[in-house]
Amino acid sequence: MSESRPKQFVAVLDFGAQYGQLIARRVRDLNVYSEIVPCDISADELRELNPSALILSGGPASVYAEDAPKIDPEILELGLPVFGFCYGQQIMAVTLGGTVGHTEKGEYGPAHLTRAGESRIFDGTAEQQTVWMSHRDAVSEVPEGFTVTASTDVCPIAAMENAAKNLYSTQFHPEVNHTECGSQMLSNFLFNICGFEKTWTMDNIIEQKVEEIRQKVGDGRVILALSGGVDSSVVAALVHRAIGDQLTCVFVNHGMLRKGEPEMVEQVFRKQFNVPLIHVHAEQRYAELLAGVTEPEMKRRLIGTEFWKVFFDEAQKLDGVQFLAQGTIYPDIIESGARKTGGKAATIKSHHNLIPFPEGVHFDLIEPLDHFFKDEVRALGVSLGLPENLVYRQPFPGPGLAIRIIGDVTPEKLEILRNADAIVREEIDAYNAQLFDETGNRNSEHSVWQYFAVLPDIKSVGVMGDERTYARPVILRAVESSDAMTADWAKLPYELLTRISSRIVSEVAGVNRVAYDITPKPPATIEWE
């Protein structure tokens, strides 16, 4: 469904910035649609996309390096409003005839900015303010027609503009929270300079997506692999709103879900939303498949391959199915090589939602979330009426508990881990809920982003009552993160850790010890396998 971007949108040219996705999200937070495109896009290709404004991202390179990313000079002559950040300011300067050089010392972190003269970018902001810098190079001479609009002690040209041509730029990063007036600057650019309207709202999005799905599907039938995760659940609710019983969801229960999950899927989709749902009980099939398998990647491969076999077995029993809906989201597209921009961006990792169609079987794809970031998917789910405990649930890997059991997967180990994990989630859910009540922020500084139990393939000696025990330990993993790229272990209160440990040892048969994994990512990964 990626062909239908809004008429007015911002194209973010990505020069390799660590904040590239953040820029796009900040624009969307202001109710304007934005899309990331590769920096080597040509002016002709950009003209075909037809954006209403451009943002040039930062990047790690020096503009004079041999392999430094460049911009097609004609892009700056298209007559579009342009806002460049950091490297974006530098590339704008050198492309238009200015110069960039090394500063005497780099500028990293908070910096004291002083405005110089009037600028529409700085409307409504203080004469002096704190901004976030991350650079060694800086513009030393502005192009013809440009004026300097702000400076710092280290960077005399901290912002510049050619207002007549709607070209604006800053050496600092307006998109990060540490720039105290960054949101105001973005707002000034979008609404005062570009004249955007706030059309990127959930109500508008739902109305638009429902109409798109109806137009594409017509009288056809759609099938969806429903996992109970956030993405597939939101797709199910959205597609069902559009076409009702023309949608059939297939829920493959591989026996490695968390406690209560199959029941929750049944409750929400069969009873609350009245979605046609096929619940495939494949627990025994998977138990036989995984017997004796210990290598993590083999577990993943077997589970994934078998999932699609089971799914397509069910799909082929249904008559008239033409479409397959799935929960591809925008970061998937970016990480798989910027599919929507001609595949020019480097591939970071293979797309996790690629479908292995059996020979002779093919469905047209419907991907209604492929323009959305994860936080937008959650907001969409709430607007569609999905319960918040489903929408705001933490990430859960497709192979399920199988990759949180170190070694082979057995019914006994699954039972132990499922019960221990339920206690971990219950206790930390309550802790996060308390933080939300106190702060009103689901992502407050101390909230836990992901948390679960791991069952290692060892036993340990213990004492329970007057008797020696030889039972399994459980490892608690709880991390703080925003994007899973990096993570730190959560500094949970001792009282909470004590309660979790006591409950697991007391309530879960076969466990006599609880350990807490305090390793950040990197060097560790969040999951153990």
Name what the model sees in each region:
Residues 1-53, 60-66, 70-71, 76-78, ...:
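RNA-binding accessory domains that recognize and position tRNA/RNA substrates
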Residues 326-328, 334:
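Extended catalytic-interface subdomain
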Residues 175, 329-330:
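Catalytic metal-binding/acid-base residues of hydrolase active sites
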Residues 57-60, 329:
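Short glycine-/small-residue-rich Rossmann-like dinucleotide-binding loops
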Residues 82-88:
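Conserved helicase ATPase motor motifs in RecA-like P-loop NTPase domains
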